[in-house]
Regions:
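Acidic, metal/ion-handling microdomains and their immediate structural contexts
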Residues: 79
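Membrane-interfacial hairpin junctions
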Residues: 145-147
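Catalytic cores of Mg2+-dependent Asp-rich isoprenoid enzymes
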Residues: 2-76, 85-97, 110-113, 130-140, ...
């Protein structure tokens, strides 16, 4: 998937824009929420979501479990090498290195994310995908201290199940989310569309996320 590159070469604006567009196509919900983060934090969120995209799509691009495990190990090794000051020749790996070096992403959190997606892949059960951990990691990019971890753990599985059309359960009614973490979780509000079997159009998504950003109600 890629070899070592010069770790001193940062991604260009064009390369960052390409990753950003990739997330817009692959995960518009989270992408919309991330627009409300500050510029530096937004890049960290996009790097995080780009890793999640690479991990989530393993089940779609391999035909054998062993090949999937190789891909998960590739990303596990890529994060470990970043900790050692090296980086692989892959735009997402380079993005992760920049954000790890800046202190906005933590290698331990990324390893846990990889483990979670691998566990879901091996079990052939998407309900085990680490949606809550992904949201918690995103929230911690925005602020290291908040009192909404339990709420994120509670609501994330309902959002993801509804978005996959696996469940029509709305899940918990929550108190408003703290303002600093809203760009990490505002898209959870879209569950109200998904439980009704609706596919909101881009404008509906943006308005719903904006309401969540303003009110904290997801």
């Amino acid at each position: 998937m890629g070899c070592m590159s010069n770790p001193t070469n940062p991604l260009s604006e064009t390369q960052w824009a390409a990753i950003d567009k990739r997330i817009l196509r692959a995960d518009e919900d989270r992408w919309i929420s991330s627009r409300y983060a500050g510029a530096s934090e937004r890049r960290a969120l996009i790097a995080l979501y780009a890793l999640a995209y690479e991990l989530a799509r393993v089940r779609l691009v391999v035909t054998e479990e062993g090949l999937g495990l190789i891909r998960f190990q590739w990303w596990r090794d890529a994060v470990s090498e970043i900790e050692a000051g090296k980086v692989r020749e892959h735009d997402v790996a380079k993005a992760l290195k920049e954000e790890i070096d800046a202190g906005r992403l933590k290698p331990g959190a990324l390893h846990k994310l990889i483990d979670g997606y691998q566990g879901a892949f091996e079990a052939e059960d998407r309900s085990l995908e680490p949606e809550a951990w992904l949201a918690l990691t995103a929230a911690n990019v925005l602020t290291p201290i908040h009192d909404w971890a339990e709420e994120i753990r509670d609501v994330a599985p309902y959002f993801s199940a509804a978005r996959r059309s696996d469940s029509k359960a709305f899940g918990p009614i929550l108190t408003p989310a703290p303002k600093p973490i809203r760009p990490a979780i505002a898209h959870f509000r879209l569950r109200k569309f998904y439980i009704e079997g609706k596919t909101p159009n881009p404008l509906q998504k943006r308005l719903s996320v904006l309401q969540a950003i303003r009110s904290g109600k997801v």
